[in-house]
């Protein structure tokens, strides 16, 4: 598993400190962008028949619970920056779950773009090129583990 530099860890921790206190609104920004970039992903959220539009989905209690869980995964990664390898089994399992519900690995990249978009919107002037790169590096590590779990759960498909 790749490692982050001390400077990258510091940038991630400091930026997450303010965002992590109020996770759901930031997660909603991230998922709004995700559905903008890849509208077909909306079909994976079958919580109820009212999840036909992006806005319906984003305001659904079940979906907001999912947003909270995703933000908690990010929180766990930030909390374990010094030893991300300890999350390996958890992330492998998460990849398996995503494969089982029909998420393809290409969507992981779109989630990464959406995460960076949320950071840019939420941090404003605090969103710098080094900060972006630090988050991208962390996300790449997390997704690599999830992708290994995804591939272990079934035939490796890319579409």
UniProtKB/Swiss-Prot annotation:
One of its GO terms (cellular component) is mitochondrial matrix. Heme b binds at residues 66, 98. Gene3D superfamilies: Globins. Belongs to the globin family. PANTHER family: BLR2807 PROTEIN, NEUROGLOBIN. Monomeric globin with a bis-histidyl six-coordinate heme-iron atom through which it can bind dioxygen, carbon monoxide and nitric oxide. Could help transport oxygen and increase its availability to the metabolically active neuronal tissues, though its low quantity in tissues as well as its high affinity for dioxygen, which may limit its oxygen-releasing ability, argue against it. The ferrous/deoxygenated form exhibits a nitrite reductase activity and it could produce nitric oxide which in turn inhibits cellular respiration in response to hypoxia. This is Neuroglobin-1. It comes from Oncorhynchus mykiss (Rainbow trout). The lineage of its organism: Eukaryota, Metazoa, Chordata, Craniata, Vertebrata.
